[in-house]
Regions:
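N-terminal auxiliary segments of SAM/dcSAM-dependent transferases
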Residues: 1-49
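Class I SAM-dependent methyltransferase SAM/SAH-binding core
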Residues: 89-92, 96-146
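Helix-to-beta-strand junctions that scaffold the AdoMet/dcAdoMet cofactor pocket
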Residues: 173-174
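Conserved beta-strand signature within the Rossmann-like core of class I S-adenosyl-L-methionine
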Residues: 177-184
Length: 275
């Protein structure tokens, strides 16, 4: 079975055979029963359990399953279809539990394309969920800063709320390939921030140029979601960087809420690698 992945030890192409990935040099990487593999060398781990833990992964999965971020997923699916050819190689960097990954893969198939798609994330617990969500996508534990993909092998790279490893993106994308970069929009989660902070801030919207890329477009997605379950409020909070830097008083106020109407806003930047 063809694969986008390369060996993290020698860089050789990986081929999937039954329950493992093999490279020409004989390095072997087992596929877990859930369907993902582990391509993060030990010397690249910065903690014993990097990324989201099991509880965080489950909360994120439950929140996204309720469709709160469906407008973003639908727009990403449409963009992926527009930007790719008949048999695209697609990589989702920082794919999380695979909500957008699976949506994009299925949209490409529904459009009559035959994609080869892979998703990488640093968290094992969250990749267990991703691999269960879509069996036809290849998932691996790996680092954004050392992507397990060959030079110029990717047609479309998606980076949704994940680390921006622009040099690696430039390396793995083919000339003329596209890079989709999703960041929070200006008023994203404004009502939540009003609860958390005495002086909430508006997110900056900017079109940043990156060497080796042509800026193509920006799309703004906005909506209002109604959260009527305290668990959903806490799950959403846990998906944001605010959970690491909010004062205790703000967290306590949020914990007292039983419902919340909140704006969501996303900016989708599209870049093309220079030919």
């Amino acid at each position: 079975m063809s694969s986008l992945f390369v060996c993290p030890l020698c860089g050789g192409a990986l081929t999937r055979r039954e329950g493992s990935y093999l490279c020409p040099a004989g390095h072997c990487f087992d596929i877990a029963r859930e369907g993902y593999t582990y391509l993060l060398p030990v010397n690249r781990k910065h903690s014993k359990t990097p990324g989201d833990d099991k509880a965080m992964a489950a909360a994120r999965h439950a929140f996204l399953e309720k469709g709160y971020y469906a407008p973003l997923c639908e727009e990403l699916c449409q963009l992926a279809v527009e930007l790719t050819g008949d048999a695209p190689a697609v990589l989702d960097n920082g794919c999380g539990e695979g909500y957008y990954t699976a949506g994009i893969y299925r949209a490409l198939c529904a459009a009559g394309k035959t994609p080869v798609m892979a998703g990488i994330d640093i968290s094992k617990p969250i990749l267990r969920l991703a691999a269960k969500r879509e069996k036809n996508v290849q998932f691996a534990v790996a680092s954004s800063y050392r992507l397990p993909a060959a030079d110029g092998s990717v047609d479309l790279l998606i980076n949704c709320f994940s680390p921006l490893a622009i040099e690696e993106f430039r390396r793995v994308l083919r000339p003329g390939g596209h890079f989709i970069y999703v960041v929070p929009g200006e008023m994203h989660l404004w009502e939540m921030k009003q609860v958390l902070y005495d002086h909430p801030y508006v997110n900056e919207v900017k079109e940043t140029p990156y060497e080796g890329f042509r800026y193509v477009s920006i799309r703004h997605i906005t909506d209002v979601i109604h959260l009527e379950d305290p668990a959903d409020i806490q799950a959403l909070f846990g998906m944001t960087p605010y959970c690491w830097k909010t004062p205790k008083a703000g967290v306590e106020k949020l914990c007292k809420l039983t419902q919340l109407d909140c704006r969501i806003a996303f900016d989708i930047h599209v870049f093309e690698k220079e030919r």
